């Protein structure tokens, strides 16, 4: 089974990240992949609190903590570097933690990746997630 890692940067918006993880869990149900989520905490000043309802369709949810606030792009770069060096995976899907990216689109990315395995798949947001 192919392994997918969803990479989510966050700064202080733990409520939105919790909602995103719940939505991902719902939307990956029945897909023939193993899903894990890595949340990269950009040195949030608010208490870290994930309130996740259900993880039935996810292998794991882990949080990486940045030592200092470095910004959205640096969180993604740090997460990608960590994944490349430490994880066994076929695909990485970066998703904003604030609802900008829609979890229901994951299946379309994976369909395209299976159809064109040697290509990088890029999406364009036309509608905010919620």
Features from the language model and the residues they span:
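Hydrophobic targeting segments
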Residues: 2-9, 17, 24, 35-40
């Amino acid at each position: 089974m192919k392994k997918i890692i969803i990479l989510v940067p966050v700064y202080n918006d733990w409520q939105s990240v919790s909602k995103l993880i719940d939505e991902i869990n719902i939307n990956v149900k029945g897909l023939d992949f193993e899903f894990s989520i890595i949340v990269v905490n950009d040195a949030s000043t608010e208490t870290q609190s994930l309130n996740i309802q259900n993880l039935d369709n996810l292998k794991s949810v882990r949080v990486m903590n940045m030592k200092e606030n470095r910004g959205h792009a640096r969180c993604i770069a740090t997460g990608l570097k960590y994944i490349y060096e430490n994880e066994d995976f076929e695909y990485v899907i970066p998703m904003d933690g604030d609802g900008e990216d829609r979890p229901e689109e994951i299946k379309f990315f994976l369909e395209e990746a299976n159809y064109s395995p040697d290509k990088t798949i890029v999406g364009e947001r036309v509608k905010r997630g919620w």
